[in-house]
């Protein structure tokens, strides 16, 4: 298999692990910076160049796309798709998951439970918007934030109103959610590959914080997700069109609640904590999907 990995940084742990495992499996692998890919769009002739040379002949591409380059990098991924290259996470699926509002709407439509969420635009509606949510504490989230950045806990209604008005003044898109106190500032990261959860870790927020992201000083321990939690995680990934995803859940009195579905979850924390070789699970999944495609006589390139 000729495999491309879309990544801006070849030194990142996740990128290095995927390259290492794929080469160990006998595949030809190349890391491509999506911002150095440029494309020609012509009826019947989708093509792409990278640093002055044509890109062609790739059987699969694994996207490791950062939030800041989502728009351009998904256009590059879409061009790969139009050229007949398989991706475990298609461009449209990444766009769905990166837009928190859209993702929440799609998940709720599939009967997947989440913290109650409200969204609005006009400042005149702020008070009624918050009343739809219920009493504080409230969690205010930027619509396109990542790694816990742009997530604020508001413990008073007046503070929530002030935050909402300030963010609107900055023309920022955001959601406001109920705060689930019984989660005790912890969540589960369920790593989905294909139709199963291949690894799980429990993340606990640092003292004085409520965000459990490891990038913000949270800690992680090995965990086992219940059958219900695994089912919810897989359904959440598939509802957005993803086959590789990090699904973040919290445990509540009404069952598991989905916080977020990450289309490019990091491998370092989950592999170190769970002891699972997640990278090889991803490469195996790509191999299996390509075999299925080829057996259907539509194998490209």
UniProtKB/Swiss-Prot annotation:
PANTHER family in UniProt: RIBOSOMAL PROTEIN BS6--L-GLUTAMATE LIGASE, RIBOSOMAL PROTEIN S6 MODIFICATION PROTEIN
Pfam families reported in the protein's UniProt record: RimK, Rimk_N
Protein name: Probable alpha-L-glutamate ligase
Cofactor list: Mg(2+); Mn(2+)
Record's GO cellular component terms: cytoplasm
Binding site for Mn(2+) 2: 260, 262
Cofactor note: Binds 2 magnesium or manganese ions per subunit.
Residue intervals of the ATP-grasp domain: 104-287
Alphabetic keyword roster: ATP-binding, Ligase, Magnesium, Manganese, Metal-binding, Nucleotide-binding, Protein biosynthesis
Entry binding sites for Mn(2+) 1: 248, 260
UniProt-annotated binding residues for Mg(2+) 1: 248, 260
Similarity section: Belongs to the RimK family.
InterPro entries per the UniProt record, alphabetical: ATP-grasp, ATP-grasp_RimK-type, ATP_grasp_subdomain_1, RimK, Rimk_N, Rp_bS6_RimK/Lys_biosynth_LsyX
Binding positions (ATP): 141, 178-179, 187, 211-213
Keyword Protein transport among UniProt keywords: no
Binding site for Mg(2+) 2: 260, 262
Gene Ontology MF term list: ATP binding; metal ion binding; ribosomal S6-glutamic acid ligase activity
């Amino acid at each position: 298999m000729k495999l491309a990995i879309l990544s801006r940084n070849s030194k990142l742990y996740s990128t290095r692990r995927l390259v290492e495992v794929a080469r160990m499996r006998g595949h030809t692998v190349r890391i491509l910076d999506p911002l150095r890919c440029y494309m020609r769009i012509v009826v019947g002739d989708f093509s792409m160049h990278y640093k002055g040379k044509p890109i062609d002949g790739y059987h699969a591409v694994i996207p490791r796309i950062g939030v800041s380059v989502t728009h351009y990098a998904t256009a590059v991924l879409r061009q790969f798709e139009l050229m007949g290259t398989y991706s475990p996470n298609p461009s449209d699926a990444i766009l769905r998951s990166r837009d928190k509002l859209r993702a929440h709407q799609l998940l709720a439509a599939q009967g997947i439970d989440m913290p109650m969420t409200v969204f609005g635009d006009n400042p005149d509606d702020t008070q009624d918007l918050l009343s739809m949510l219920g009493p504080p504490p409230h969690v205010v989230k930027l619509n396109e934030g990542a790694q816990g950045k742009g997530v604020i806990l508001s413990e008073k209604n007046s503070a929530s109103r002030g935050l909402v008005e300030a963010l609107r003044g900055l023309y920022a898109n955001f959601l406001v959610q109920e705060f689930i106190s019984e989660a005790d500032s912890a969540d589960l990261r369920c790593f989905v590959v294909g139709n199963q959860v291949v690894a799980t870790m429990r993340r606990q927020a640092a003292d004085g914080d409520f965000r459990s992201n490891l990038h913000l000083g949270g800690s992680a321990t090995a965990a086992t997700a219940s059958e219900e939690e695994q089912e919810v995680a897989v359904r959440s990934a598939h509802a957005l069109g993803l086959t590789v995803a990090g699904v973040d859940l919290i445990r509540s009195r009404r069952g598991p609640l989905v916080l977020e579905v990450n289309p490019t979850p990091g491998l370092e924390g989950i592999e170190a904590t769970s002891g699972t070789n997640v990278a090889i699970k991803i490469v195996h999944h790509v191999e299996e999907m390509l075999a299925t495609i080829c057996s259907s006589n539509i194998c490209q390139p």
